[in-house]
Amino acid sequence: MRKIITTTICALLFSFGLYAQQDAMFTKYMFNSLVYNPAYAGSKDHMAIGLLHRTQWWGIDGAPTTQSITAHTPLRNDRVGVGLNLINDVIGPTHSIQANISYAYRIPIGKSKLAIGVQGGVNSWRADWTKLSLEQQVDAAYDDPSPSFILPNFGGGIYFYNDRFYMGLGVPHLIEYDLRKKGLDGGEVETPIWAKQYRHYFFSTGAAIPLKGEMLVFKPSILIKNVGLLSGINKDEAYQNLGAPTEFDIDLSLMFYQAFWIGASFRSAFEAFDDTSSFDSVDLWASYYLQNGLRIGAAYDYTLTKLQGPAQGSFEVMLGYEFNYKTKQLVTPRYF
């Protein structure tokens, strides 16, 4: 049973060209905003560093595991922020490493700020198809047993925020790549799907609503993810076969005394092309800010899909550090 499930995951996720959500997924996305939107760089007004590990569908061989490292800070010019994000993503026989440098310029609008950000970097992707047990031993799609790519990357985003509200749109990968490898005869391999890296769009918004002063703050947020929205595919049949659903994460959380944070979220998806929807998971998470500027957190996803039986949920652990850039004195963390 486990081997069958693993093979199914390979078929659905391992093919880098599959027209689906290709970017890494995180339950604690609100602590990893730089990954989705380069305009977030420097928005905390002090340097912030974060490390996050995710194990998805724990208990299934070949299931995704992801690590991210982010760091961002404002410069002496308060309007400029810079950042760095690294992502290591392993799904069965495939391995992807991304590195991006971000630059954001902030424009004051009353008590709010509008940031415009760009990023540039590189994505290294490779696979080892010999780890798969193929139903068809002669498959043109796997003529190259160890394909690899080095892909330059450029992204952009906008981010509007103040002390109580934020809204942003990020496109971390603006360039789309045709990833079809040449066959043994020199021609392009015929596959039932288009081997392509697609453009992803991430829309996020949230608020911080005091319920009892700063002692108790309610913080709702949402992240909407779409892939291939403007890819220029005109064939309805191709859309139906290859179109990834629009996914959304809805999160509701409470923060106590600006230190202890608990939340619950719901992840689902809507397929615009055949009017269907699906429930992916319900999630619980907690985070704590220590007095020395350290932040720790963890999350658990309860799967609602057909993997509910063999998988034992998904897990995330997070470690962060924040400090005041100008005075080097540790400060109370901000809400966003």
Predicted regions and their residues:
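Absolute protein N-terminus
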Residues: 1, 20-21
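Positively charged n-region of N-terminal signal peptides that target proteins for export
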Residues: 1-4, 109-110
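Residue-level detector of intrinsically disordered/flexible regions characterized by low predicted structural confidence
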Residues: 4-5, 221
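Generic early N-terminus positional signal peaking at residue ~5-7
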Residues: 5-6, 25
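Bacterial N-terminal signal peptides
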Residues: 7-17
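Subset of outer-membrane beta-barrel
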Residues: 21-336
